[in-house]
Amino acid sequence: MRLVDLKIQDVAFGGKGVAREQGKAVFVPYTIEGELVSAEIVREKRQFAEADLVEVKQSSPNRVAPECPYFGRCGGCAYQHIDYEHQLAIKWRQLRDALQRIGKLKDVPMRPIIPSPRQYAYRNRITVHAQDGVIGFFRRESHRLIDIESCPISREEVNRALAELREQKHVRDGHYTLRSASEPRVFSQVNDEVAQALRDLIVGLVPPNQELLIDAYCGAGFFAKALLGKFERVIGIDWDRFAIAAAKENASEKETYIAGDVESELTRSDGFLAVEGETRRLGSRRSMTLIIDPPATGLTEGVRKAITDLAPETLIYVSCNPPTLARDLKELQHKFVINSVTPLDMFPQTAEIEVVAHLEAQK
């Protein structure tokens, strides 16, 4: 380990500041571009090194005091030391850079980032871990727990649930998901206000009077049910049978929800999709919209091929991982035109970015 003085040049996706030292990149957490810092090299590889921040010698005007007493130890937040407007600018730039560097996409029509109305107290659920009497979150880049009494980015109801858990005399080792009272027990977005903005954005991007919507990775139908008025037929697919069961509750005749693997359903029988005993040729449907909201790993090669084979008129790609989005758009651009890419700040104070890409089939 050695101590070095560094000038931070950028903030990389993931939240760490980037400097150069002896010809290699050095990643330093809790820093801002333009800052002069003292850091201790803790891991050194051939092409890069990682360091811990020791002292900020020349601070950025965008540096602020974090609101959480656990910031810097807890692994949840990365940006509490940065004022909110600059957090938004960093995330927008990180998305643009990923599209250019990984996706080789030039002149992408990026829209302004949609901010969160709440910068703190926005999370409607958290998952805490309990071990040997300690209840909290994992430390940064560690499997060791840090004891947490409250979480400032979580709603008051969630923190009350955490306090109630901590008051129990005997808490078994394991993990506990604490929710707001109205929060469903299937997957949903953690920031209610930005989730609504996300849904409104997608509703605005989808043209009216369409024949078919396929909502892949649909969950409980958050997008599909908001779009019912624009389609004759709606099909949702998700591996989570509990989410599909929730989607089926009060579903109309035009809605069909399938518990299954997205790749298997989209590629079944050479481009056919089984729907309640019928087999419908989807590849011939031009008046079709496909929404894909995959996990952070992005699309498999099979799903990408199924999308190009289906050739939907409108394709909406919702992503929580700019690098995998960029990788997938690099392939999809051969069959689709990218109309817009819109980032949303679903997770203030963290390094996470939500993105919506709007594509249309090439004519």
Label each residue range with its predicted role.
Residues 31-38, 160, 164, 168:
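Short nucleic-acid-contacting surface segments enriched for D/E, G, S/T with interspersed K/R
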Residues 1-70, 142:
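Terminal RNA-binding accessory module
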Residues 19, 34, 77, 321, ...:
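Residue-level signal for inorganic ion chemistry
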Residues 2-5, 13, 154, 168-363:
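Rossmann-like S-adenosyl-L-methionine
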Residues 38-40, 127, 214:
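Hydrophobic beta-strand signal
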Residues 54-66, 72-166:
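Extended interfacial segments that mediate partner engagement and assembly in macromolecular machines
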